[in-house]
Regions:
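Non-catalytic tandem-repeat scaffold regions and their flanking low-complexity/translocation tails
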Residues: 1-175
Length: 175
């Protein structure tokens, strides 16, 4: 699907929508085409995703997840910008989980910088993402993660990170 997206992304999207299994294959195919398209022409992919959203909740556009994935491969800051503009909903949750993984792959310092910028207006999302990030980062660098936890405000998110840090610490001690 990615190769086809390089040549004719709209034809690839039409095929994925009409010829693949409606549940998983189609969603995956569309996401991959949009990711490939976003690498080459972010504005075109974004425009198509916005124009072709058929979600029950139009403001919660699952097609933008493919755009975020594609942008994150070469321009994570552009992907983060799209993520931040997403309204609360499934697309934002999925994009945040994906970006948490990408930022943690870049390195602990960049991941913590990204996490510290997450808005505090959605404590559930923040707690979940910081928890996922804390678990991954604790496996990479337990001391740096501990310093990060110390810098966090006492809230649900910091407790989730602390719990994941302690789980990793205990696991390391038992080995």
């Amino acid at each position: 699907m990615r190769s086809w997206a390089e040549i004719d992304p709209e034809a690839a999207l039409a095929y994925a929508d009409s010829s693949l299994d409606a549940k998983s294959e189609s969603r995956f195919g569309i996401s991959e085409v949009l990711a490939g398209w976003a690498n080459r022409d972010p504005e075109g992919a974004i425009s198509w995703a916005k124009a072709n959203n058929s979600s029950d909740k139009p403001e919660d556009n699952p097609l933008l997840l493919g755009v975020v994935k594609g942008l994150a491969e070469n321009n994570i800051e552009a992907a983060n910008k799209i993520f931040r503009e997403l309204p609360p909903g499934s697309a934002k949750w999925q994009a945040s989980t994906f970006l948490a993984q990408k930022y943690s792959d870049i390195g602990i310092r960049k991941a913590i910088e990204w996490a510290d910028q997450l808005p505090k207006d959605d404590p559930r999302l923040r707690s979940t993402i910081l928890g996922q990030l804390g678990a991954k980062l604790a496996r990479q660098d337990i001391e740096a993660t501990a310093k990060w936890v110390e810098s966090l405000q006492d809230d649900k998110a910091s407790f989730t990170v602390m719990n994941n840090l302690l789980t990793q610490w205990v696991t390391n001690c038992l080995l």
